[in-house]
Amino acid sequence: MNKLYSLFLFLFIQLSIKYYNAKVTVDTVCKKGFLIQMSGHLECKCENDLVLVNEETCEEKVLKCDETTVNKPCGDFSKCIKIDGSPISYACKCNPGYDMVNNVCILNECKNVTCGNGKCILDTSNPVKTGVCSCNIGKVPNADDKNKCSKDGETKCSLKCLKENETCKAVDGIYKCDCKDGFIMDNESSTCTAFSVYNILNLSLIFVLFSVCFFIM
């Protein structure tokens, strides 16, 4: 029993150290985005059509690199740069510490890491920078398969879902704070409101009025 307890305590401490040393923590406020959790890390996800300029900040993405968009974000962890030459040209380049792989900027340490049902992250608990797999919720690294995300396993949600009528949910392989069952997000107030029969009737009434106005016109 003592050996089992010691092993559990060791794993708990290692996981705590990893989350503590990470740039994104449970207390991070994502600018124009929201916090998510996978098996081994936390990260910010951007709202629609925005991209990450750093671990905590999302901004609007430019669609083309030219003289008017130099230093503007053109993708996650990338920006437009000017290339001197004849003629002068412009390109989308990854931020320092990242490399372009299949048109996506990934950490230098992750170029040769394949995770499967997850993604490669920087192992912040290791003094030597290495890439490790953080898995989709429901999967964990498999020591018998080069630590790829090929093993079923559970990960406890550590997100602080503090808004009223909000809870932690597993959605598409990640944990995120979402409205409880029976509630829906009100985009104007950014709060979870009850999705009652009253709401449905209001929507139906709006649809009927719109249809009547359309046919009258």
UniProtKB/Swiss-Prot annotation:
InterPro entries: EGF-like_dom (IPR000742), Pvs25/Psv28_EGF (IPR010423). It comes from the Eukaryota. Glycans are attached at N112, N165, N187, N202. Keywords: Cell membrane, Disulfide bond, EGF-like domain, Glycoprotein, GPI-anchor, Lipoprotein, Malaria, Membrane, Repeat, Signal. Residues 1-16 form the signal peptide. SMART domains: EGF. Coiled coil: none annotated. Residues 197-217 form a propeptide. It is found in: Cell membrane. This is 25 kDa ookinete surface antigen. It comes from Plasmodium reichenowi.
